[in-house]
Amino acid sequence: MSDPFYPHGHGGAAGGEGAAAAGYSSYEVDLIAARYGGRPLANPSSAAADLDARLAGARRSMGVLYHQPIMGSHSTVEQIEALYSSNTMTKRPRLESSLPIYPQRPGEKDCAFYMMTRTCKFGGSCKFDHPQWVPEGGIPNWKEQAANVEESYPEQEGEPDCPFFMKTGKCKFGSKCKFNHPKEKVNALASGNTNDKHLIADSSILPVRPSEPLCSFYAKTGKCKFRAMCKFNHPKDIEIPSSQNEPESAVTVEGETDIGSAADSVSAKMQTPVAAAQEFNSKGLPMRPGEVDCPFYMKMGSCKFGSTCRFNHPDRLVLNFPLPLGQTILPTPESMLLNSSANFMQGFDFHAAHMPVGPGPVTYPQRPGATVCDFYMKTGFCKFADRCKFHHPIDRSAPDPSANWEPAEESVQLTLAGLPRREDAVVCAFYMKTGVCKFGMQCKFDHPPPQEAIAKVSNSGS
């Protein structure tokens, strides 16, 4: 095995007397201490010379052991022991560092780049603090600890409330924000009180916008869940109706509104009261005479809002159909009725009820002089109905005079090439250059025969 005192291995003793033991005797320990400690050996023997020869290769290792560099300086064993001593009275050696020194600014924030890399490109001009205890290479995972100090926001009376501060309680602009930051309003919202009295008492939280429409939800309940973010008007002198005065037949239709886009689409989904219908059609949908017909119901025959829909849903069944010839409705004597509750069957005809019932006739607009609606003439149907701007003749089989109109044919003399002769018109320039005309008989210019064309060219050239 290798040994730090015998880097070249153990050799035999002088004279060939056995091999040296792996451990050291007390004499060998005293010899090593005397050689490197500066003390003379009391009883030197002849074995000292042999031991010096064997320990010659260990001098470098011992030198390294007793001369370790600490932060650029060379320390002895006594200095190392003093450095790590637990005695507070021991004088410790001053450690000198070869790393660059940057400005120390106690009270300022630590230079983030210096703390992570132990370097700073600004050098002495850096305005931050550079502690000397940072090791070489810096602290890669260093993060600045945020000071636990509550930031104050400006309260500017007369200015609009900061919407982001009213919603979150924070403002990224801090003291530079030009809006008002009322702390008492934010504390009132964060307290969680949502009763009517609290909201009405704190109605100053809601924005007053005289030029905007009235917030309908605020007018009904005195509350507004969008608070300062609402873009509608919230007057403070409005009378809030109590819940006891509201009729029980009022049904509130409320659409779910996304809070992220509420400020832009509140008007489209705001809640409005709808009175309960008194009559319903055969499908159970409300009939509201005087209201606009439900467009979806008129087109598809159904309505996803059901009984809460505010539009009219007329019964699409045509009950006023003509009776077959020879049938009359006779009143039934009261003596033949089983009870008085069967009076509704008095004027009902069962034969007529089994006749096929279809939608009523649709009348399309008559616009004489306008263009005939092609789709209506082909199919007898027009999806635009009374909004169509074309003419819808009642008799589709009648010929359309405008469709059969043809321009009066002119008597035009043709040349041997089949091109028109128009002596009172200008000569066709393309025909004079190439001898042909792509428009043929439809060309409105003159096409003289070749001999006449050559004569015209020669006369014009002379």
From Swiss-Prot:
Keyword Zinc-finger part of the UniProt annotation:
yes
In its keyword annotation, does this UniProt entry include Metal-binding? yes
Q: Where are the zinc fingers (C3H1-type)?
A: 105-133, 156-184, 209-237, 288-316, 367-395, 422-450
Q: Name one Pfam family in it.
A: zf-CCCH
- Alphabetical list of SUPFAM superfamilies matching this protein: CCCH zinc finger (SSF90229)
Which keywords annotate this record?
A: DNA-binding, Metal-binding, Repeat, Zinc, Zinc-finger
A GO term, aspect molecular function: mRNA binding
Q: Which Gene3D superfamilies match?
A: 2.30.30.1190, Zinc finger, CCCH-type
The identity of this protein, by name, is Zinc finger CCCH domain-containing protein 8
Give the originating organism: Oryza sativa subsp. japonica
